[in-house]
Every structure is written in structure tokens, then in C-alpha cells.
Amino acid sequence: MDNGIKYAVFTEKSLRLLGKNQYTFNVESGFTKTEIKHWVELFFGVKVVAVNSHRLPGKGRRMGPILGHTMHYRRMIITLQLGILFHFYPLNSRVF
């Protein structure tokens, strides 16, 4: 399984959810909740209690006379067990 998580999201809502031990990520749109749950548990070594997701729409873009749009993407809110500390880097890698 490839890395499904694109990046962590830091909005007002996601920062408020950090107090509830919930973390927000944008993920590849083809991944399911169970795949992301298993990937987070394996890669970060934490216990995931729940995974909520929603699909965000693409936005219209214009370059001169050409109309286009950006791709849609999926956002997942991952709830961890209470008392678990979460680091945004994997436990088995070196961070410099």
C-alpha cells in the first residue's frame, strides 16, 4: 500500500479538533477509511478509534479564455485513543 496521506491540514476547525485528540489529513481520493486506518496504525504506531471522511469538491479555474478545474480530494478526520501522543513523523524514521 502506498502512502495515502498527502499532508496534514491546519485550519481553525482542525486546530480545535486537536483538543479532542482528532487529527485532520488530506488523503488520496481512491483510499478507503479502513485502508487509511491500517496505514496510520502501522506507520505511526498509534491506536485509531474512528475515521470520518468527506470529499471536498474541485474548484473552477480560468487561464484566459480556457476554463478548467482542480481535482476533488478527500479529507479524513482520524480520532485516536485518549492519552496517546501523536507525532507527524513516523516512529521508525530519522527526522533531521
Curated annotation (Swiss-Prot):
Q: Where is the signal peptide?
A: none
Indicate whether Plastid appears among the record's keywords.
yes
Keywords annotated in UniProt: Chloroplast, Plastid, Ribonucleoprotein, Ribosomal protein, RNA-binding, rRNA-binding
Which Pfam family is one of this chain's hits? Answer: Ribosomal_L23
**Localization:** Plastid, Chloroplast
Instruction: Indicate whether Plastid appears among the record's keywords.
Output: yes
Top-rank lineage group of the source organism: Eukaryota
Q: Record's GO cellular component, any one?
A: chloroplast
One biological process term from GO is: translation
Molecular function (Gene Ontology), one example: structural constituent of ribosome
Subunit and partners: Part of the 50S ribosomal subunit.
Function according to Swiss-Prot or TrEMBL:
Binds to 23S rRNA.
Q: Which family does it belong to?
A: Belongs to the universal ribosomal protein uL23 family.
Name assigned to this protein: Large ribosomal subunit protein uL23cz
Q: Which organism's genome codes for this protein?
A: Sorghum bicolor (Sorghum)
